[in-house]
């Protein structure tokens, strides 16, 4: 779809979100809602580009947040349901959290006991409360993303679950997945059903958390629908899902420019973007993002290592090859850069943040925001 966008006219670097691709994802998610009656909400920890919230709000039921600021953003910019979960809440923020949120999920019974009287006495609206459970079952292989690894701080395990403290609790929440298919969810639900079923039957809702790659091409949507309906019908409860990546998967790009080409045993292209600053998951995961019209390092004739303009020696994006030699001034386009990019980027070395750009059929290219020195200075 980028063929009708003139990359030369875009600021560099920039995050570019194509609303046509975003809408395609939202339509698929809405199909799941219609087939199951489940409620799907956006996990803003993955994607908080609020200029797209009016579009997202046409399809999804609201947002789920991990902090006061995310909750406020969802409340102000989408204006639908606002859920929140945190391993622990700050007392000096909790009154404001209640202002913005209609669902508050607690990580422990300690936190629930600390705040339940405040929630009960809150008069402006009814706030539903939940407890996060730790099913102690996850198929995530990377520990940094696995909330069920040994001695995890996330959620209440069966051994520590206290049924006497459930009075006033409306639902249970679990989040054990990361970029996974519905067969993983089906196996997880068997564990949750077996170990926590006697508590679920007392609830109004069950939240399946995030990590569901629903909009990926190979995702088995029928198994997802069957799994949702199984729990929904068995316990006569509402079901929530809170994907982040799936909402904006493959709908965004990072456009950058080649600044220099040097040789040191191989061709090295220095670009005006940074893995450390602009796409930190590349180093954290790690993974190698795809570039449009590129191949693996030995696939085409002209091979390059792409590096950043920072002082970090390991700020390497990856090794690529191209059918034609790169030149200074060439534009390169990284794929799938809407998620966990804008929400995690930083100004290490004083490297400027990429501009934020949106494309829609109605308005074409819109430059949503450009950053500069004051954005860097104001954080320090």
Residue locations for each model-derived region?
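N-terminal capping/small domains of soluble enzymes
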Residues: 2-79, 85-88, 274, 322-335, ...
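A short small-residue
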Residues: 5-10, 170-175, 209
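Active-site-proximal beta-alpha core segment in soluble small-molecule metabolic enzymes
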Residues: 38-205, 227
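Glycine-rich beta-strand-to-loop/alpha-helix junction loops that act as flexible
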Residues: 43, 176-177, 206-215, 243-245
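Feature marks short, surface-exposed loop/turn motifs that line or immediately flank catalytic pockets
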Residues: 137-139, 178, 214, 247, ...
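Charged helix-capping and loop-helix junction motifs
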Residues: 186-191, 220-226, 256, 321
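Charged (often Lys/Glu-rich) extended helix/loop segments that serve as interaction or gating elements
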Residues: 227, 238, 243-380
């Amino acid at each position: 779809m980028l063929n009708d966008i003139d990359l030369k006219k875009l600021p560099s670097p920039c995050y570019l979100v194509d609303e046509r691709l975003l809408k395609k994802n939202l339509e698929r998610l809405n199909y799941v809602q219609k087939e199951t009656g489940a409620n799907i909400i956006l996990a803003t920890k993955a994607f908080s580009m609020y200029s797209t919230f009016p579009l997202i709000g046409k399809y999804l039921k609201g947002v789920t947040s991990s902090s006061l600021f995310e909750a406020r953003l969802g409340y102000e910019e989408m204006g639908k349901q606002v859920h929140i979960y945190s391993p622990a809440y700050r007392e000096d923020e909790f009154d404001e959290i209640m202002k913005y949120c209609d669902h508050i999920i607690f990580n422990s019974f300690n936190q629930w006991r600390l705040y339940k009287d405040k929630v009960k006495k809150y008069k402006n609206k009814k706030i539903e409360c939940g407890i996060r459970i730790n099913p102690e079952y996850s198929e995530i292989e990377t520990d940094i993303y696995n909330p069920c690894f040994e001695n995890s701080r996330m959620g209440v395990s069966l051994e520590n679950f206290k049924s006497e403290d459930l009075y006033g609790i409306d639902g249970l929440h679990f989040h054990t997945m990361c970029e996974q298919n519905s067969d993983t969810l089906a196996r997880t639900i068997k564990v949750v059903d077996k170990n926590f079923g006697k508590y679920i039957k007392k609830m109004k809702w069950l939240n399946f958390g995030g990590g569901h790659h629903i909009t990926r091409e190979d995702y088995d949507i029928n198994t997802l629908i069957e799994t949702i309906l199984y729990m929904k019908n068995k316990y006569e409860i509402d079901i929530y899902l809170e994907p982040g990546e799936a909402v904006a998967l493959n709908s965004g790009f990072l456009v950058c420019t080649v600044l220099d080409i040097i040789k040191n045993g191989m061709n090295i292209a220095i670009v005006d973007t940074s893995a450390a600053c602009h796409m930190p998951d590349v180093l954290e995961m790690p993974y190698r993002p795809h570039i449009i019209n590129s191949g693996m390092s030995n696939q085409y004739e002209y091979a390059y290592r792409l590096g950043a303009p920072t002082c970090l020696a390991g700020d390497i994006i990856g090794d690529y090859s191209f059918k034609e030699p790169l030149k200074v001034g060439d534009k390169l386009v990284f794929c799938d850069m809407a998620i966990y990019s804008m929400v995690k980027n930083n100004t290490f070395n004083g490297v400027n943040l990429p501009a934020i750009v949106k494309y829609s059929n109605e308005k074409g290219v819109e430059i949503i925001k450009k950053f500069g020195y004051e954005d860097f200075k104001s954080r320090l």
